[in-house]
Amino acid sequence: MVEGARIDQAHHENWAQRALNETVHLNQAVERAIAMVNLSETLIIVTADHSHNMVFSGYATRGSNPTGI
């Protein structure tokens, strides 16, 4: 089992870059799991118990890095 709880923790703290990084890490873990099993004999399920939205407010200029806030 792989859990991505740090994605949720980052969203609670409004840490956009950390939430994105943790999502990438979860994706990499799922890719590794897929590589380790026989997919004709194994079911891999990725799910969530809730979600968060990510809002970038303010008056950023074009080309600004939203994760550098």
How would you describe each model-predicted region?
Residues 1-69:
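A post-motif C-terminal structural segment
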